[in-house]
A protein has these predicted regions:
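Substrate-positioning beta->alpha
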Residues: 149, 153, 181-186, 199-222, ...
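Mid/C-terminal beta-alpha module of Rossmann-like enzyme folds, strongest
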Residues: 220, 224-287, 303, 319, ...
Length: 343
């Protein structure tokens, strides 16, 4: 599809060198948008791939208000995807600067330059450990760590701007996965080599979103008239359990799923000790409490609002998405198995 169809639509994507942002930038370009990406290092491999796809690069840091202002200039759409995710060696102030303050810079610049549509990417994590499932957009906030708290603070700025009349839409994704992302690689590898262990009962709810569906949801939030001023959870049609997720991964890598379940309390104690031991040295600990949350925190959400108001329809079921992800890992040389299902 050429530029002629949407030649008047110019979209800035922040976080475009990351997993979700890169997929979104290429999808918008394929739709005919002129796409601009704010990147720290134009010579980096991810930035070069964007440029090869016809995406304009502008150098700058998401924590720099002046750089954001320059990037937003002459844009009709802004998709704010950039964030600092869960790593244990960043200070709380760093999370706040990137996940909260930068949102304010984006909103101010968008207002100053008359941007037509703004999509702010938040997280389902603002709801924390969900007590009643499936949760929805009205479920109480319950952030459980500095990442979730800082993302909630950023979302509050976006909600405030929307109440003041800014053309803002807010998306809260469930866990995003798919080819191009390595966050779930450790899970796939340890399931394949037989070293993965389930801590706890394995019956906690787990909700994912395949990357293509996530991109569809973000674009709908930036184009559909009914999205303005609204918040939408975006995810798969249905959720699973941790045991269900592990079983799908095992099927995709051709092994039997683990049957042993270990108590989670000793793991949490070890994570706490590891975190405190590493922090004075600025080391990212191999085990920390946020990783233990993988086994303990329920994540299950309704996406009915996005389906009803935006026409959002997830297209890639979990089994297909996990299989595609495993195949990509295999092509990258990160998995050893053939992918044939174990007998």
């Amino acid at each position: 599809m050429g530029d002629s169809l949407l030649a008047d639509r110019r979209a800035l994507v922040t976080g475009a060198t990351g997993f979700t942002g890169s997929h979104l930038a290429h999808a918008l370009r394929a739709k005919g948008y002129h796409v601009r990406a704010l990147v720290r290092d134009p010579d980096g491999a991810n930035a070069k791939r964007l440029a090869e796809g016809g995406i304009e690069l502008i150098q700058g840091d998401i924590g720099d208000a002046e750089a954001i202002d320059q990037a937003v200039a002459r844009m009709t759409h802004v998709f704010h995807i950039a964030a600092v995710y869960r790593t244990a060696n960043h200070s709380d102030a760093y999370y706040e600067r990137i996940n909260r303050d930068a949102v304010g810079y984006v909103l101010e610049a968008a207002n100053r330059h008359g941007v037509e549509r703004i999509v702010h990417c938040s997280t389902c994590g603002v709801h924390g450990d969900v007590a009643e499932i499936p949760a929805n957009e009205e479920t109480a906030f319950n952030p459980g760590d500095v990442y979730q708290r800082s993302k909630l603070a950023g979302e509050m700025l976006a909600q405030e701007a929307a109440r003041a009349g800014a053309p803002v839409s807010i998306v809260r994704p469930t866990g995003i996965y798919g080819p191009g992302d390595d966050r779930f690689l450790k899970l796939f590898r340890t399931v394949e080599n037989g070293t993965f262990r389930v801590f706890g009962k394995g019956d906690i709810a787990y909700h994912l979103t395949y990357i293509d569906d996530m991109v569809d949801g973000l674009i709908l939030a930036g184009e559909h008239p009914a999205a303005i001023g609204e918040v939408f959870l975006i995810g798969d049609d249905s959720y699973t359990t941790l045991d269900g997720l592990v079983a799908e991964v095992a099927r995709a890598v051709g092994v039997k799923p683990p049957s042993l379940h270990l108590p989670v309390v000793p793991l949490m104690l070890a994570a706490t000790a590891c975190e405190f031991a590493c922090r004075p040295f600025g080391i990212d600990p191999p085990l920390h409490r946020r990783r233990v949350a993988f086994f303990t925190k329920a994540r299950a959400f309704s996406v009915d609002k996005a389906k009803d108001r935006l026409g959002f329809q997830p297209k890639v079921p979990l089994a297909d998405g996990i299989a595609r992800t495993a195949e990509w890992y295999r092509q990258e040389g990160w998995l050893k198995g053939s992918g044939k299902t174990a007998a």
